[in-house]
Amino acid sequence: QLWNAHNPFRAVLLCADGHMVIWDYKNAPFLSCFNPLVREVRAGADLFYFDRGDKVDDAARAFAGEVSSLLAEHAPGLTRLAIDKPMLHAHWALAAAGFTITEGEEVTEKARAVKCPDEIRAMRCAVHACEAAMAGMEAYARTAIPRGGVTENDVWAVLHAENIRRGGEWIETRLLTSGPRTNPWFQECGPREIGTNEILAFDTDLIGTYGICCDMSRTWWIGTDRPRPDMVDAMRHAHEHIMVNMEMLKPGATVPELSAGCHVLRPEFQKQKYGCLM
């Protein structure tokens, strides 16, 4: 659940021998029954103030005690513990229990970098679902906006609905703007009514099917008039930028090679260019 992302009650311990323990909802151990990798289901990792109040430290010590017992059995003699997203009281309690806390996010990110065939198929499915959701939003925008009275929020709501319809989960941002609000970029969508013959731009930033993030950007011209010449020129330059950079993406390509050979935007597009290369 998204709620766990900002009120973390769930934790997973992966021991050196492969033994995996999950701390979950106290009365819902069945949530992990489908996963053969989970050997134990426990409760008690809800180490945040909303749940524990002034006794978070007591709960953290109890949690650290469970971790100590588990590792004594499944990783005897080992005291290094990599944690990716530690709650503060948990960090203190585990350190006090004698563990050497190390960076766990690097470990998990590098593990995610290796994709098995099922994960590749899941990614393709998620991308297809995202593209279908965008198509639904585009159909609504092109049909409804010319009638008038359609806001940025109205269009953005369609992407949410189409994502959920296909098994998606949530959307991280609200990056959809229209007309003059598209520049500078990074404003959130709002109640502005979108006019005809205006630009509509968005970035999906959605967590879609199988919990996979699909981050796609699109810019649409809504209306029957031709866009201004400077808009057409900017679009053509952006298309060239994408196509040149795509040609460099191939197995074995290194980051330094991509950095050295990437397409360079013209000077007038440098000031507000995006924060990443591609």
Give the location of each predicted region.
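Active-site neighborhoods and metal-handling regions in enzymes and metal-associated proteins
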Residues: 1-278
